[in-house]
From Swiss-Prot:
Residues 33-78 are lumenal. Pfam families: Plant_vir_prot. It comes from White clover mosaic virus (strain O) (WCMV). One of its GO terms (cellular component) is membrane. Coiled coil: none annotated. One of its GO terms (biological process) is transport of virus in host, cell to cell. This is Movement protein TGB2. Belongs to the Tymovirales TGBp2 protein family. The keyword Transport applies. Plays a role in viral cell-to-cell propagation, by facilitating genome transport to neighboring plant cells through plasmosdesmata,. Residues 1-11, 100-117 are cytoplasmic. It is found in: Host endoplasmic reticulum membrane.
Amino acid sequence: MPLIPPPNPQKTYQIAVLALGLVLLLAFVLISDHSPKVGDHLHNLPFGGEYKDGTKTIKYFQRPNQHSLSKTLAKSHNTTIFLIILGLIGTLHGLHYFSNNRRISSSLHCVLCQNKH
């Protein structure tokens, strides 16, 4: 069966542009810094902290054990990704095992013409 292009490729382009837009939006949300900004134009404390000089004192909330918290979140993030991948593999294996056409999909026969290639 020869591959032929779709009669109207505009839908393909619309889907590609929509997917690219969603990826860019997701990247912007995940990468950009949305933390509150504290301080003035000379003394900026975006992640909390304390600044003192002769005439000015700025104290802003600093998370306790920020570095150990970020390490814990990174470890749990890696574990979550591993469990999602393992779950997807298990789901695909289960779908293959319990599918109605298991005889055809597990053999080396072509699904379309039932011949060996």
